[in-house]
């Protein structure tokens, strides 16, 4: 392929990504037959994905029960996240997970001033399957396996309850690495469509459950984004984090204060003291003609679409755009460093979003000439 041809091909894919990203997940095209949706997913799956029919069935089912438009753009968005998070392995292995888990136990023991010999003795106790907890933890390869060990440890050993306060420290799992807390909250508000194996937590680690909750987290909320990459950033950083980061950028212009563009509009520690973003808005209360309580109420809508309708949001952008003499972007990828015992190098939300966006572009390219 010539240089010119390569440039034209790259430009075509870029245009396809932009056009696809403009589609709103909740806007439905004419209804498609389920078998047609499954067939398209099979075609869109990357080379090397095993059990293509099974993946297609679970993905199509999630879109159906969540009532999300099965557009090529939306399907590719889900496939891109699955590819990035698990490479289409329902219960992906985590390198060195046993070592990571033992280090976390030791860290928590130190926090609670529990001597090391007490921890070592507790881990020699035989678990429900006859093996010691220490042996089971050393042998775990996946988060599902580790979650089950922690469930057992918390239920049967007093030290487990002391260290983990009845809260399983495995927070994400499954093929889309979705948050267990999000899944449990979602299941309380919406009927889970499949039979539950003991708990919603365990469903997260299944292919069908992980896809269902992951697709809900990615696409089942309204967001006025012009590119899908901002949903990928939100998937990593939280609902509307990209919109909120753009608001913080506008607020920095309007207030003259330096702000972290992390998408967090209020302080999430104990929630009582105002954070930097709230203080910056308060500094403009006279100019914006809003009171401190009004500011707080507006910022508390930061995880909903309704924040955009508040006086705070609209007046901050109006002031910032007047000062900047230009129209400001309404979405920015949040500037967040990713932290987890599983992460061994410097990663950010931007790194995640761009990696997923590249997979999304590749999926759209596989789709061919058009986006349904």
Where are the regions a protein language model picked out?
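Sec-dependent signal peptide hydrophobic core
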Residues: 8-12
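Cell-wall glycan-active module
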Residues: 1-6, 17-372
């Amino acid at each position: 392929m010539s240089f010119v041809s390569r440039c034209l091909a790259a430009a075509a894919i870029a245009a396809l990504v932009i056009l696809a990203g403009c589609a709103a997940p909740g806007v439905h095209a004419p209804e498609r037959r389920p078998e047609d949706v499954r067939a398209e997913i099979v075609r869109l799956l990357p080379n090397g994905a095993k059990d293509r029919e099974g993946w297609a069935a679970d993905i199509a089912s999630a879109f159906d029960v969540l009532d999300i438009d099965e557009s090529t753009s939306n399907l590719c968005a889900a496939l891109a996240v699955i590819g990035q998070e698990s490479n289409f392995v329902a219960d992906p292995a985590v390198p060195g997970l046993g070592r990571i888990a033992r280090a976390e136990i030791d860290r928590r023991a130190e926090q609670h001033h529990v001597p090391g010999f007490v921890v070592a003795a507790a881990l020699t106790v035989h678990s429900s399957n006859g093996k010691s907890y220490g042996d089971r933890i050393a042998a775990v390869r996946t988060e599902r396996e580790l979650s089950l060990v922690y469930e057992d440890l918390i239920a049967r050993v007093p030290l487990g309850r002391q260290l983990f306060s009845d809260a399983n420290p495995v927070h994400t799992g499954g093929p889309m690495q979705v948050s267990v807390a999000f899944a449990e909250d979602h299941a309380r508000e919406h009927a889970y469509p499949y039979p539950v194996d003991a708990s919603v937590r365990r469903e997260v680690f299944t292919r069908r459950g992980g896809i269902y909750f992951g697709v809900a987290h990615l696409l089942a909320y309204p967001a006025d984004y012009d590119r899908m990459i901002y949903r990928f950033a939100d998937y990593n950083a939280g609902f509307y984090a990209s919109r909120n980061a753009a608001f913080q950028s506008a607020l920095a212009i309007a207030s003259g204060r330096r702000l972290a563009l992390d998408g967090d509009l209020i302080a999430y520690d104990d929630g009582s003291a105002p954070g930097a973003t709230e203080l910056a808005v308060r500094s403009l209360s006279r100019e914006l003609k809003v009171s401190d309580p009004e500011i707080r109420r507006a910022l508390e809508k930061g995880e909903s679409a309704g924040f955009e309708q508040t006086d705070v949001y609209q007046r901050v952008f109006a002031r910032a755009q007047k000062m900047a003499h230009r129209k400001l972007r309404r979405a920015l990828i949040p500037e967040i460093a990713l932290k987890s015992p599983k992460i061994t190098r410097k990663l950010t939300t931007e790194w995640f979003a761009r990696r997923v966006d590249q997979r999304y572009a590749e999926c759209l390219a596989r789709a061919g000439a058009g986006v349904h």
